Amino acid sequence: MLFRSPPHVRRWFQGLRQPDNPRVSCCGEADAYEADIFEVDGGRYVAIITDGKGDIPNGTKIPVPNHKMKWDEGNPTGHGIIFIGIQGQVYCYVAPGGV
Protein backbone atom coordinates (compact mmCIF):
# COMPACT_ATOMS: atom_id res chain seq x y z
CA MET A 1 0.00 0.00 0.00
CA LEU A 2 2.29 2.74 1.21
CA PHE A 3 5.20 2.12 -1.14
CA ARG A 4 2.95 2.69 -4.16
CA SER A 5 1.79 6.05 -2.85
CA PRO A 6 1.34 8.97 -5.24
CA PRO A 7 3.84 11.84 -4.98
CA HIS A 8 1.61 14.09 -2.83
CA VAL A 9 1.17 11.30 -0.27
CA ARG A 10 4.92 10.58 -0.21
CA ARG A 11 5.54 14.30 0.42
CA TRP A 12 3.01 14.18 3.26
CA PHE A 13 4.87 11.24 4.85
CA GLN A 14 8.20 13.04 4.45
CA GLY A 15 6.87 16.22 6.06
CA LEU A 16 5.28 14.69 9.17
CA ARG A 17 6.92 15.64 12.47
CA GLN A 18 6.52 14.13 15.93
CA PRO A 19 3.94 16.13 17.88
CA ASP A 20 6.03 16.18 21.06
CA ASN A 21 9.33 16.81 19.24
CA PRO A 22 8.60 18.78 16.05
CA ARG A 23 12.24 18.86 14.93
CA VAL A 24 12.14 15.07 14.46
CA SER A 25 10.22 13.29 11.71
CA CYS A 26 7.64 10.61 12.37
CA CYS A 27 10.01 8.42 10.31
CA GLY A 28 9.25 7.07 6.89
CA GLU A 29 6.78 4.91 5.05
CA ALA A 30 8.73 1.79 6.06
CA ASP A 31 7.85 2.52 9.72
CA ALA A 32 4.20 3.22 8.89
CA TYR A 33 1.38 0.75 9.43
CA GLU A 34 -2.28 1.15 8.59
CA ALA A 35 -4.42 1.15 11.72
CA ASP A 36 -7.96 1.73 10.52
CA ILE A 37 -9.53 0.31 13.68
CA PHE A 38 -9.14 1.70 17.17
CA GLU A 39 -10.56 1.36 20.63
CA VAL A 40 -10.40 3.44 23.77
CA ASP A 41 -9.12 1.73 26.91
CA GLY A 42 -9.33 3.74 30.10
CA GLY A 43 -9.19 7.03 28.23
CA ARG A 44 -6.22 5.87 26.16
CA TYR A 45 -6.34 5.45 22.40
CA VAL A 46 -5.38 1.98 21.14
CA ALA A 47 -4.63 1.59 17.42
CA ILE A 48 -5.27 -1.81 15.86
CA ILE A 49 -3.03 -2.81 12.95
CA THR A 50 -4.97 -3.57 9.76
CA ASP A 51 -2.09 -4.08 7.30
CA GLY A 52 0.29 -6.27 9.25
CA LYS A 53 3.80 -6.76 7.94
CA GLY A 54 7.04 -8.12 9.33
CA ASP A 55 6.86 -8.64 13.08
CA ILE A 56 3.56 -6.78 13.56
CA PRO A 57 0.59 -8.85 12.32
CA ASN A 58 -2.98 -7.75 11.65
CA GLY A 59 -4.97 -7.30 14.82
CA THR A 60 -2.02 -6.20 16.95
CA LYS A 61 -3.15 -3.59 19.47
CA ILE A 62 -0.77 -0.68 20.00
CA PRO A 63 -1.47 1.78 22.86
CA VAL A 64 -0.84 5.31 21.59
CA PRO A 65 0.58 7.76 24.13
CA ASN A 66 -1.47 10.98 24.09
CA HIS A 67 1.63 13.02 23.27
CA LYS A 68 2.10 10.97 20.06
CA MET A 69 -1.35 11.76 18.64
CA LYS A 70 -0.94 13.93 15.55
CA TRP A 71 -3.95 16.23 15.17
CA ASP A 72 -2.38 19.18 13.35
CA GLU A 73 -2.00 17.60 9.89
CA GLY A 74 -4.48 16.34 7.35
CA ASN A 75 -4.31 12.74 6.23
CA PRO A 76 -4.50 12.07 2.48
CA THR A 77 -4.13 8.29 2.83
CA GLY A 78 -7.68 7.46 3.88
CA HIS A 79 -6.24 5.24 6.63
CA GLY A 80 -5.20 5.62 10.22
CA ILE A 81 -1.39 5.57 10.17
CA ILE A 82 0.84 4.62 13.09
CA PHE A 83 4.62 4.95 12.96
CA ILE A 84 6.38 2.30 15.03
CA GLY A 85 10.10 2.01 15.74
CA ILE A 86 12.15 -1.16 15.73
CA GLN A 87 11.72 -1.57 19.50
CA GLY A 88 7.96 -1.02 19.33
CA GLN A 89 7.99 2.64 20.31
CA VAL A 90 5.27 4.83 18.80
CA TYR A 91 6.63 7.85 16.94
CA CYS A 92 3.30 9.25 15.73
CA TYR A 93 -0.30 8.31 15.12
CA VAL A 94 -2.46 10.07 12.53
CA ALA A 95 -6.18 9.32 12.68
CA PRO A 96 -8.01 8.16 9.54
CA GLY A 97 -9.71 10.72 7.36
CA GLY A 98 -8.85 14.27 6.50
CA VAL A 99 -7.33 15.60 3.32
What kind of region is each of these model predictions?
Residues 66-73, 81:
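Short, conserved turn/kink motifs that form compact alpha/beta structural patches or helix kinks used as
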Residues 17-68:
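Mature extracytoplasmic domains of secretory-pathway proteins
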Residues 18, 39, 74-75, 86:
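A generic structural signal for short, solvent-exposed coil/turn residues
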Residues 11, 43, 89-91:
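Intrinsically disordered, low-complexity segments enriched in small/polar residues
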Residues 5-6, 64:
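Intrinsically disordered, low-complexity regions enriched in Ser/Pro/Gly/Gln/His and often acidic
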Residues 1-2:
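Short, small-residue-biased leader/transition segments that mark boundaries at the very start
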Residues 75-99:
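C-terminal partner/receptor-binding element of secreted or periplasmic proteins
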Residues 6-17:
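Short, intrinsically disordered, charge-biased short linear motifs at domain edges
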